[in-house]
């Protein structure tokens, strides 16, 4: 691999809830993803789309998270702490949260002008 163990975790949080302190939530979820993937927070990218038009069974708040990384994903171990984080920080119940995990091939992810593989 070109960049050693840098795996560039990415998380995209879409929610129908309105988030007051977006920067704080982005920093905290970056720290969480860094911890769960065992990667430096320096390489975690986080995106937040709040107050989105979303519907999941009814009009109560819901959340959809996309998590991508070159390796370092363990969905069965990561799902619960991520759902708990969303519940604690935003108040969305676990049964109103979907998470999509994607292990991206190193040849399909680039940073700093070059792919990782």
Spans of model-derived segments:
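Short, Lys/Arg-enriched N-terminal segments with co-localized hydrophobic residues
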Residues: 1-7
């Amino acid at each position: 691999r070109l960049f050693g163990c840098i795996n560039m975790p990415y998380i995209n949080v879409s929610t129908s809830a309105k988030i007051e302190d977006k920067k704080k939530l982005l920093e905290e979820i970056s720290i969480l993803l860094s911890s769960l993937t065992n990667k430096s927070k320096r390489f975690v990218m986080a995106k937040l789309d709040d107050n989105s038009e979303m519907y999941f069974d009814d009009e109560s708040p819901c959340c959809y998270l996309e998590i991508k990384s070159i390796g370092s994903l363990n969905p069965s171990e990561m799902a619960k702490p991520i759902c708990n984080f969303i519940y604690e920080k935003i108040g969305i119940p676990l049964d109103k949260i979907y998470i999509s995990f994607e292990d991206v091939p190193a040849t399909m992810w680039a940073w700093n002008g070059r792919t990782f593989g």
